[in-house]
Structures are given as C-alpha cells and as structure tokens.
C-alpha cells in the first residue's frame, strides 16, 4: 500500500471516527440537560445516575479521541506535516486537491464544533447553577448556625430559672 493510496483509507477512518464522536457528544446533550434539572431540584439520586451515564459516555469519547489522534498522526506522516500542528482546519487546507474530502471534513468539523459548543454552554450553565446552589446551601447553613447561637444566648433571663429550670436558692 503506497502512501498515496493510504490517504483515502485514513480519511475514511477519520470521517467515521469524527462522526462517532459527534454522535456521542449529541448523546451527552440530553444527559447534561437532565443534569440541569437534577441540580435545580437538588435531586441527589438523579445526579448519581447522571454522573454514571456521563462517565460511560466520556470513556467512549476518550477512546474515540485516542483513535482520532492516531489517525491524524498517520495522516500527518503521509502528508509530511508536523503531527503536533495538524488540526482539522489545517488538514482541510492540506486537502485542497481533494475538494470532496475537504468539503466532507469541513462539514463534519462544523457539526462537531457546533455540538461541542452547545455542550460547553450547557456545562457552563450547570457549573453556574451548582455554584449558586452551593452558595445557597452555605447561606442556609450560616443562618441555621446563627439562629442556634442566638437562641442559645436568649435563654438567659434576669433570674437563672429559665436556664437551669429552677429558681436560684436564696441564702
């Protein structure tokens, strides 16, 4: 198999991998939206289930990311490019002589980028919601602590009978 013949095969593998990655990210969107509802409702059991599902999808995505990196390394080698500088955009530029591959890659790249940006927006909202929820919990804890402290000191009366439950003995 010549280097020239390897490029179409590698491009096909890359396209399949990018499509699979994009589908996994699409699967994450409703999971993250469910997470938003669980955070807002402080539903800890739902959060546990969601985090398990997230981990499962992230593990699959991580695997595909590793496959994609290997394919991009192979493509960079075939094209004589620096693998560390090879991005999907630079690969699309390198494919000027193959406009069909260039167009397909650009379409997949755009879909993937749009999906990832949507996930980032949802994750940012979830992060903000979590921070607000934690601040509210901390505020409530402080109110409870201050209420307990102030109610403990208000038990004292002019005679100590309220504190000790008996009137002081007179001597």
What is each residue range found by the language model?
Residues 1, 75-76, 139:
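Generic hydrophobic, helix-prone segments enriched in Leu/Val/Ile
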Residues 1-7:
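Short, small-residue-biased leader/transition segments that mark boundaries at the very start
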Residues 3, 40-41, 124:
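Alpha-helical architecture
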Residues 8-92, 96-97:
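Extended, charge-rich alpha-helical scaffolding segments
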Residues 86-171:
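Short terminal interaction segments
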């Amino acid at each position: 198999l010549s280097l020239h013949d390897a490029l179409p095969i590698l491009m096909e593998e890359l396209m399949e991998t990018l499509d699979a990655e994009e589908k996994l990210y699409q699967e994450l969107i409703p999971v993250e939206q469910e997470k938003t509802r669980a955070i807002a409702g402080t539903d800890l059991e739902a959060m546990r289930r969601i985090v398990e599902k997230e981990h499962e999808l992230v593990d699959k995505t991580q695997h595909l990311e590793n496959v994609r990196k290997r394919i991009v390394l192979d493509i960079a080698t075939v094209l004589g490019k620096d693998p560390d500088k090879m991005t999907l955009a630079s690969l699309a530029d390198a494919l000027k002589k193959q406009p069909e591959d260039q167009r397909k890659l650009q379409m997949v790249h755009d879909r993937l980028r749009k999906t990832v940006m949507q996930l980032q927006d949802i994750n940012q909202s979830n992060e903000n919601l979590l921070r607000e929820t934690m601040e509210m919990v901390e505020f409530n804890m402080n109110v409870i602590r201050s209420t307990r402290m102030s109610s403990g000191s208000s038990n004292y009366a002019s005679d100590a009978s309220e504190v000790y439950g008996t009137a002081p003995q007179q001597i």
